[in-house]
C-alpha cells in the first residue's frame, strides 16, 4: 500500500475553486478542458488536487473560466 501524502493547501484551494467556478458556469470537465486547451483528465486531476498546476495552466484555466488567475488561489469565502 502506498504512503499517504499530505495535500498542499494551495493545491487544494485551486482544486476546489476550479470545481466551483466550473460548476457555476455549467461546464463539464470536458468542456472546460476544450476551452482551456487541456485534456479533460488533466482538469479532473486538478480538481482532485492530484497534480501540481503550472502557472501557465492556471492562466489557461482562469481564462476559460473568465476569472482572474488569483481567484483560483483565493481561500474559500464563508
Task: Label every model-predicted segment.
Residues 54-71:
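DNA major-groove recognition helix of helix-turn-helix/homeodomain DNA-binding modules
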Residues 20, 24, 64-67, 78:
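Conserved amphipathic alpha-helical interaction elements at protein-protein interfaces in regulatory
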Residues 1-3, 63, 73-78:
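Short, charged recognition helix plus adjacent turn
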Residues 16-35, 60:
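Short basic helix-loop element that most often maps to the first helix and adjoining turn
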Residues 37-51:
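Recognition helix of helix-turn-helix/homeodomain-like DNA-binding domains
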Residues 2-24:
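A short, Lys/Arg-rich alpha-helix, primarily the initiator
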Residues 18, 32-33, 43-46, 72:
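Conserved hydrophobic/aromatic packing and binding residues within compact polymer-binding modules
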